């Protein structure tokens, strides 16, 4: 599948001049074997001292081949057990990276964690890196930030975006199905992310790019058509999934933020990853996003029932729930960080009168989101996790999460806006 990067750059009807950091994306069967040829051409032939970062599993999947193809490359191979994108993982990479005298480019061979550890270390060294994904498991391959758990804080750290992506669809097709299901969950999460973006746009005029929204909806349509193919290991279906995930990352570069890819569903996933009211859970990021999506879809569609009745009441003003934040985030430093994130109060931007006037438009936007049972059916096709219980939670985690998760990011979502409505407590249960 050919991805023409130039199609995503330049002047757009939204009024912005979209730019990308990544120079090229190659997504096709046998792409890995082209790596030496690609690196011998400009602008990549300037890099003479390459270091590959992988773990034991991704070394077997693709790293071993990269080592053969690129004679003399240095290899940092990590133990995948308990390997996370955190300060410990960063230190493990640095421990092997620091003794290497000359490094002018890094290569990440793996999925989400390996990429975040590589991009963070590349940023610290002020050198570029190349992405070699081994699974269609996450949308962050071309991200400009590293999603890190930093001393217990869930943070988006400034980091390097890859200058080149070489995604071999045969390797991706052969990845464990659980990783693929994680990617499906992450990509499906764009339904609520886009809805949150569109609702905020009509309420407070936040910038939005309709072209990016349409690109992502098109990728979602193709994903739905590819679900049977994914379960049958059809390489074309895997290319469609990988394309959608890469497109999501490119959309973030085009806008300069994560709005096109992250909404209330991601806030739930990130909240669980912080483990403030729950233990650490053994679930991939995309699995948590998929489960979060199901909860958000259920809440939003339940809200539509009340919106259609038109007899709801709205608060004149919604204050930050400081007591809830303090009760939830018992670590003093973390609590202060969350409070700072919510100062000023984003809901001050929402005019209740406008909120009521836009009811029909809000209903229309929410009805574009598949209902919870439809999402469950899609995830079942790829053997994905599909409930709170599947990731180790009890059903009451839905209400606990819905109330506080909006506060972990300085971003308006409909989940946060729901706090204006008198039916709020009923729909989050």
What do these predicted regions represent?
Residues 23, 125-222:
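A glycine/threonine-rich phosphate-anchoring loop and its flanking beta-alpha core
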Residues 100-135:
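A short, small-residue-rich loop immediately preceding and capping a beta-strand
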Residues 1-105:
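ATP/NTP phosphate-donor binding region
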Residues 217-302:
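A conserved active-site cap/scaffold subdomain adjacent to cofactor or substrate pockets
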Residues 29, 45-59, 179-183, 394, ...:
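N-terminal low-complexity or amphipathic/hydrophobic leaders
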Residues 2-16, 304-429:
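C-terminal charged capping/lid subdomain of soluble metabolic enzymes
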Residues 184, 188, 238-252, 293, ...:
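Short alpha-helical scaffolding segments that buttress acidic/His motifs in well-ordered protein cores
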Residues 17-19, 44-45, 98-101, 122, ...:
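Solvent-exposed alpha-helices and their adjacent loops that cap or buttress functional pockets
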